[in-house]
Amino acid sequence: MSQLLVAKVLCMVGVFFFMLLGSLLPVKVIEADFEKAHRSKKVLSLCNTFGGGVFLATCFNALLPAVRDKLQQVLSLGHISTDYPLAETLMMVGFFLTVFVEQLVLTFRRERPPFIDLETFNAGSDAGSDSEYESPFVGVGGRNHGLYPEPTAHSHGTGLRLRELGRPGPLRLLSLVFALSAHSVFEGLALGLQEEGERVVSLFVGVAVHETLVAVALGISMARSAVPLRDAAKLAVTVSAMIPVGIGLGLGIESARSVASSVASALLQGLAGGTFLFVTFLEILAKELEERSEQLLKVLFLVLGYAVLAGMVFLKW
């Protein structure tokens, strides 16, 4: 078994357990404590911004060069030469496809939240308000007993209503898994399709940071919404398996070693790059940098995240 294959298998196992622990630990240990939630939100917000910097470097320093190299190999097989920026165009197609899928899912769910983000800690606060913690996690007076109160005319919060997810029904569960994991499969594909060890390591760090934070946000949401542990475990296992599934698909495509597999690899890596763009700019930076608290510190963590991954690519781990 080659070292590259071993690295990818370890990535599959690592991401799965990071996400599983991140989503289940809050269900077990977090109580409905406002001050604890306040502190957790600030720490995770900084980690999320650091993850945004990691994803920037992953996208532009690791994944984009890989897509260019793969496309060049495919074009050389057909003796085709062009100066058109095919890699960049493919990534933008992936970006628009991810936006379309997200909006399609949310349209059918008749809701307006993003897939999952740290606004789960801030549901119900007015957009751009000075305080990120104006609305409590648990409603007062018995009306709103979950993390997410009913929306009002003056409420701009967009948290994911995980209270409904504990109810039985395969269609509801399928809708949830698709909403949370559509882009996770493409992140896994990007890992599985890589042919160089240092790019696998760079992508793994970026994916692990982001998806672990996603899992923690999901776990805290389930804890606040009193989702039963058994249902939370089923949900956590299902969501955590999405990136390993993507890695496995990528491994299968890459191992075929044919012209068709090379074309598929180039196309899928380009589309996966668009998913990374979506996560970086619309899920992380757009939401973290619009808040008025700790803005300069968040910029510092953004630069640090980028520098760490850019340095790893430069040193060719």
Swiss-Prot record:
One of its GO terms (cellular component) is plasma membrane. It is a multi-pass membrane protein. The chain crosses the membrane at residues 4-24, 43-63, 86-106, 173-193, 200-220, 233-253, 266-286, 295-315. Residues 25-42, 107-172, 221-232, 287-294 are cytoplasmic. It comes from Rattus norvegicus (Rat). InterPro entries: ZIP (IPR003689). GO terms for biological process: cell morphogenesis; embryonic cranial skeleton morphogenesis; in utero embryonic development; limb development; T cell homeostasis; zinc ion transmembrane transport; zinc ion transport. It catalyses: Zn(2+)(in) = Zn(2+)(out). The lineage of its organism: Eukaryota, Metazoa, Chordata, Craniata, Vertebrata. Keywords: Cell membrane, Ion transport, Membrane, Phosphoprotein, Transmembrane, Transmembrane helix, Transport, Zinc, Zinc transport. This is Zinc transporter ZIP3. Belongs to the ZIP transporter (TC 2.A.5) family. Transporter for the divalent cation Zn(2+). Mediates the influx of Zn(2+) into cells from extracellular space. Controls Zn(2+) accumulation into dentate gyrus granule cells in the hippocampus. Mediates Zn(2+) reuptake from the secreted milk within the alveolar lumen. It comes from the Eukaryota. The modification Phosphoserine is found at S125, S129. It is found in: Cell membrane; Apical cell membrane. Residues 1-3, 64-85, 194-199, 254-265, 316-317 are extracellular. One of its GO terms (molecular function) is zinc ion transmembrane transporter activity. The gene is Slc39a3. Coiled coil: none annotated.
